[in-house]
Amino acid sequence: MKHLAIFGSTGSVGQQALAIIRSLPHLFNVVALASYGNKRDLFFEQIREFSPSIVSVYDEQLYFEIRKEFPKVQAFLCEEGLLAAATANEIDTIVAASSGIVALPAIIAAMRSGKTLALANKEVLVSAGELINGLAQQYQTKILPIDSEHNALYQCLEGRDTSEVRKLFLTASGGPLLYKSKEELTRVTIQDVLKHPIWNMGAKITVDSSTLVNKGLEIIEAYWLFGLEHAEIDAVIHPQSLIHGMVEFEDGTVLSVMNPPSMLFPIQHVLTTPKRCPAPHKGMDFSIKQILEFFPIDEERFPSIALARQVLQDKGSSGPFFNAANEILVQRFLKKEIAWCDILDKLTRLMKNHRVSSCTSLDDVFSVDKEARALAQEI
């Protein structure tokens, strides 16, 4: 039985992780739940159903309500609860499904405590990949990627020598604006951007999908996860989102992972590995016609890919700067302060003007993050 802490339990990935746990109750014990939003009713339902001994929230009113409603549960406010879960002896696996880098100190504490890290948070590796990789080697941390693309690559590479790999391919749906002309892109609305043709995701990641910044972040994440050179990591448009990642080996053979576009598949793989367990969700249906298309990304139209490659060349502070600046620009777009086209234009200018510095500690990461947010708010 695995003993789990779920960071971000009321978010999309957190809820789906609990759905998998619900379907395989004999395999899991939920020891800790952490929520970053104010979804009171949902979080209370989760506490009642899974009976965690540790809970953590970021809303002070909700914290006091939990203490009153669940007096036997250890309730914590803000980072204190994440750190309590990260260092609890009875927990062996942390499911990091929160967004941003708020959980970074707890993730590092978990690594130092010998926990397995089930990682659904790409910002952690984008912002602190060098730091995380160093700790993973030092403490022999097992990092299991939940992102569908990286999970697919992980499955293809499992037990194989990366020296035999020619190239990794992440697939991209192309997002909601894939077939719009350059002229049409100047007039897109928030409603246009949030209508993703395949995935049902939060607003921020859906905007990132439309600019392909999400794919840029994933290229950076793949670099830190798999230890290949950035020239050996690529992305291709695959509108059907049935193939999630491909590995081309030196002999020209390509291995891939195929499943319907649902996070339930990579989440279940990570939670149950090394076993393959019966799934409550449906797999591929080959009784109907399936079409698979692949074509290259227009990097002139989507400079986010080139920006990600520049981050990997520069390293240091460029990762946390890129991540934080983009996050603020997306927020400004969603508030109707800037146009969609401004996101990549302003991000390109910010990255061009950024002076790369060393970034080897938590303080460094948070300092660069703060600087990038301020500059992205002003530009």
Curated annotation (Swiss-Prot):
Name the Pfam families for this protein: DXP_redisom_C (PF08436), DXP_reductoisom (PF02670), DXPR_C (PF13288)
The protein's GO terms of the molecular function aspect are: 1-deoxy-D-xylulose-5-phosphate reductoisomerase activity; manganese ion binding; NADPH binding
What does the entry give for GO biological process? isopentenyl diphosphate biosynthetic process, methylerythritol 4-phosphate pathway involved in terpenoid biosynthetic process
Q: Where does 1-deoxy-D-xylulose 5-phosphate bind?
A: K122, S148, E149, S173, H196, S209, N214, K215, E218
Matching InterPro entries: DXP_reductoisomerase, DXP_reductoisomerase_C, DXP_reductoisomerase_N, DXPR_C, DXPR_C_sf, NAD(P)-bd_dom_sf
Question: What is this enzyme's EC?
Answer: 1.1.1.267
Q: Which reaction does it catalyse?
A: 2-C-methyl-D-erythritol 4-phosphate + NADP(+) = 1-deoxy-D-xylulose 5-phosphate + NADPH + H(+)
Which residues does the annotation say bind NADPH?
T10, G11, S12, V13, N121, E123, G202
Q: Which cofactor does it need?
A: Mg(2+); Mn(2+)
Taxonomically, the superkingdom here is: Bacteria
Task: Give residues annotated as binding Mn(2+).
Answer: D147, E149, E218
SUPFAM superfamilies from the UniProt entry? 1-deoxy-D-xylulose-5-phosphate reductoisomerase, C-terminal domain, Glyceraldehyde-3-phosphate dehydrogenase-like, C-terminal domain, NAD(P)-binding Rossmann-fold domains
Keywords associated with the record: Isoprene biosynthesis, Manganese, Metal-binding, NADP, Oxidoreductase
Q: In which pathway does it act?
A: Isoprenoid biosynthesis; isopentenyl diphosphate biosynthesis via DXP pathway; isopentenyl diphosphate from 1-deoxy-D-xylulose 5-phosphate: step 1/6
What's its job?
Catalyzes the NADPH-dependent rearrangement and reduction of 1-deoxy-D-xylulose-5-phosphate (DXP) to 2-C-methyl-D-erythritol 4-phosphate (MEP).
Family in the record: Belongs to the DXR family.
What is the protein's name according to its record? 1-deoxy-D-xylulose 5-phosphate reductoisomerase
